[in-house]
Amino acid sequence: MKPVVALVGRPNVGKSTLFNRLTKSRDAIVADFAGLTRDRHYGNAKQGKHEFIVIDTGGFEPDAAGGIFKEMAKQTTQAVAEADVVIFVVDAREGISAQDHEIAKYLRRLGKPCVLAANKAEGMLAGAQLVEFFELGLGEVHAISAAHGQGIRTLVDLALAPLHLEDQDDADEQREPGIIKLAVAGRPNVGKSTLINTWLGEERLVAFDLPGTTRDAISVPFERNGQKFELVDTAGLRRRGKVFEAIEKFSVVKTLQAIESSNVVLLLIDATQGVTDQDAHIAGYILENGRAVVIAVNKWDAVDEYQRELVKRSIETRLPFLKFATMHLISATKRQGLGPLWASIAQAYKAANCKMSTPILTRLLLEAVQFQSPKRSGMFRPKLRYAHQGGMNPPVIIIHGNSLEHVTDAYKRFLEGRFRKEFDLVGTPMRIEFKSSTNPYADKATA
């Protein structure tokens, strides 16, 4: 499971700049998805072979009367408490402040790995001008410039060092094949705990032992109709003896970790409220991680026909990037519509791990070009020659040819539709990458 790094500090010290610096390598992955809402407070980052989740906790603004704890939002406090390591960002140019002392006091009491980063330190003599920050009692001060990218790699290495991480490739290899890792995601009070407890109470769910569970993560392995599942905690699962039950608890950290460690995500939407900003952010994170997804609209029994139409329309307009997902209308309390969910979950998992042969992909590509050729862009008309699979979970198709940088988004969607129909890719995102061949005569022509 990916570790979580929380960026903490008072306002305007450069946390957002550092966040953007750490996560910018991931932005290109989701740039092609129309309508995607990206929450700028959390994202994925990678350094070397180590991937991690970054959370920008926002600014701490303690007031004189209540102090820091009244001003800290509940989720912010929880995110910091649940993070694996904290990067405390201070302003090297402004120097130490009373707010910095308050935050440092809170972090010392928290007692978890913490790295102190003095931002905006470009051009400074680290030793002389940063010595005052030792007063915070958090050890060594590390000079960085988030805006210029100075000292960032060393900072991340220091932050991840106490966690003794294994390489991401090794972690992926340890996943037991044939087990569908399922996360139930959704905002607070959407009915996650009710649905999970309903599932856990079914006689058809038979628990089995699963070796090598990930660190500190509560997950429930079970079997249903011959298929093994592992339910990854997002709702606050707790163990009572040999029995698990879910409590209604929302944790950003747990949700993000569960999504990235799952194969399939069941996204719950509240029918009484429709799609909210938080729903869209969670959906965006699911897509960013390339996870298969099934949408379930809960509390369907509690709304009238007019509200039902509004909910359906809000899903179409606010989650257009998930139109590949199957949608179910359910009531967890009345156990209505729950049975078909399992078939859709299995279908999404199968689609995400679909194997596609090069001859079939190339045939489909050439048939698509013959049916509708890509538009010419100025002097150039893209020539699509052959295709092959570049990965699974999610499926990646790589198309080779010439002048492929001129392929339009509309044509890319046209190709995606053809591939999805042929391989029945329901419930999974897919990615199409274009690789243009270099012109061997280009240099000679300009010589």
Curated annotation (Swiss-Prot):
GO MF entries: GTP binding; ribosome binding
Naturally occurring in which organism (per UniProt): Albidiferax ferrireducens (strain ATCC BAA-621 / DSM 15236 / T118) (Rhodoferax ferrireducens)
Biological function: GTPase that plays an essential role in the late steps of ribosome biogenesis.
UniProt KW keywords: GTP-binding, Nucleotide-binding, Repeat, Ribosome biogenesis
CDD domains: EngA1 (cd01894), EngA2 (cd01895)
Gene Ontology BP annotations: ribosome biogenesis
Record-given protein name: GTPase Der
InterPro entries (alphabetical): G_ENGA, GTP-bd, GTPase_Der, KH_dom-like, KH_dom-like_a/b, P-loop_NTPase, Small_GTP-bd
Record domain EngA-type G: where: 3-167, 180-353
Residue numbers binding GTP 1: 9-16, 56-60, 119-122
Family: Belongs to the TRAFAC class TrmE-Era-EngA-EngB-Septin-like GTPase superfamily. EngA (Der) GTPase family.
Sites where the protein binds GTP 2: 186-193, 233-237, 298-301
Subunit structure: Associates with the 50S ribosomal subunit.
Gene: der
Entries under HAMAP family matching the protein: GTPase_Der
Ranges for domain KH-like: 354-438
Lineage: superkingdom: Bacteria
